[in-house]
Amino acid sequence: MADLRKVVLDVLKPHDPPISVLAKRLADVPGIDGVNISVYEIDQKVENVKITLEGSFKEITPVNEVVMDIGGTVHSLDEVVAGKKFIEEEQTLQERTQ
């Protein structure tokens, strides 16, 4: 089975630990070569973040475990790239004509 190469997750997490700590923990997951975390909404006790992971890994279960371990929840899996090369998302005809 082909490896996952890129995964984008929408995650709700508490303010603590900070995203720098979460990024380091995710980067330690076997097969993860790079991590990008962006905060896009902050509430009183939690923050919503977009997590982008790149590398060559078989499944996202270890990633989910890290997120749950820090008290977070994966809201959605927003993008996945698998296979030998990266395929960029293309606009559909409807999107190009809007």
Sequence positions of predicted segments:
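Long, contiguous binding/interaction regions
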Residues: M1-Q98
